[in-house]
C-alpha cells in the first residue's frame, strides 16, 4: 500500500528576481531555464524545467546550452496568419544562456 503525499507549492527564484512556482507532491532540487536578452534590452526567463537531483539539473543545463547555442543571434519572428509566413521583427536574441537555480526552502 502506498501513502500519498499531499501536494505543496514549491518556488524557485530566478537571478533576475522572477519567481517560478509549481504545485507538486514530488521533491525537486533545481529549476533550470533559459534566459534571453534581446537587442532592445528586454530580459526574459523561459519556462523552467524542474529537476529532482543535481545530476539531472546538470543534464537539463547541458540540453539548455545546446538550445541556447542555436538561438544566439537569431531574429525574433512572428507568424503572419493572413499571409501564412514568418515576419522578422528587427529584434535579435543577443544573449541566450541556460541557468539552474536551487528550489527555495
PLM ranges: what are they?
Residues 9, 23-27, 31, 54, ...:
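Positively charged, low-complexity intrinsically disordered regions
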Amino acid at each position: 500500500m502506498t501513502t500519498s503525499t499531499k501536494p505543496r507549492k514549491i518556488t524557485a527564484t530566478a537571478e533576475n528576481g522572477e519567481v517560478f512556482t509549481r504545485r507538486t507532491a514530488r521533491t525537486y532540487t533545481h529549476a533550470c531555464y533559459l534566459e534571453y536578452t534581446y537587442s532592445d534590452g528586454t530580459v526574459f526567463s523561459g519556462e523552467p524545467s524542474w529537476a529532482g537531483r543535481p545530476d539531472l539539473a546538470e543534464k537539463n543545463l547541458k540540453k539548455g546550452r545546446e538550445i541556447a547555442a542555436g538561438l544566439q543571434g537569431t531574429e525574433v519572428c512572428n507568424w503572419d496568419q493572413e499571409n501564412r509566413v514568418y515576419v522578422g521583427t528587427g529584434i535579435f536574441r543577443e544573449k541566450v544562456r541556460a541557468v539552474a537555480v536551487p528550489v527555495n526552502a
